[in-house]
Amino acid sequence: MSNRTFQRGDPIGHAFADPGLLAQALRHRSAGTPHNERLEFLGDGIVNLLIAEALYQRWPKADEGALTRARAELVREGALAVIGRTLNLGERLTLGPGELKSGGHRRDSILADAVEAIVAAIYLDCGFERCRAVVLPWFEPSLAALPVGKAEKDPKTRLQEWLQARQLPLPQYALISESGDEHAKQFHVACILEQPAARAEGQGTSRRLAEQQAAATVIAQLDSNT
């Protein structure tokens, strides 16, 4: 399965000045060299730095333990694989015949590695500031949905308390779809408010995470209208 050059408007959000970096980031070792393992190594460090910085800035009251747990949740293999699917990386990966036949383009580990490799490719292509600007939006739904320690309430709790304070009906959460293999489930959920009328959708590797993401989006809608 060969990669396609990303164009403007594609989910990744970056047009590469050096297409060779993109090609390498999407080439699994089963397809020969140069493959993406060195880029994956570099990207792992960059992702950890970006997420650590984002959490440090966004949750000033959270202690070290809460920040560490939050970062671990955001950069774990399953979470990165969800991003890989959102970016449609599976259909762009270059895999050897064996990996292709065994469904490697759907495997969490391969997708997560490709995400890290692409982060490194963006960094090498255009530097850290641009890399941050491109990559952080990939994590934004999960950042917004993640409860960080006792200092921060999760989006579902915040939304419920906002509605209760105004004596308004509580939100309803509806499962839109559930897809993927047992080891790579993807849940698609809607959060629906009766009053004020609002609706948002969220996706995640568990129904809880999908509901948190949907609630976070509804909160953002309410904030923009006040």
Swiss-Prot record:
It comes from the Bacteria. One of its GO terms (biological process) is mRNA processing. It catalyses: Endonucleolytic cleavage to 5'-phosphomonoester. One of its GO terms (molecular function) is ribonuclease III activity. It is an enzyme of class 3 (hydrolase). GO terms for cellular component: cytosol. Its EC number is 3.1.26.3. Residues 154-224 form the DRBM domain. Digests double-stranded RNA. Involved in the processing of primary rRNA transcript to yield the immediate precursors to the large and small rRNAs (23S and 16S). Processes some mRNAs, and tRNAs when they are encoded in the rRNA operon. Processes pre-crRNA and tracrRNA of type II CRISPR loci if present in the organism. Homodimer. This is Ribonuclease 3. It comes from Xanthomonas campestris pv. campestris (strain ATCC 33913 / DSM 3586 / NCPPB 528 / LMG 568 / P 25).
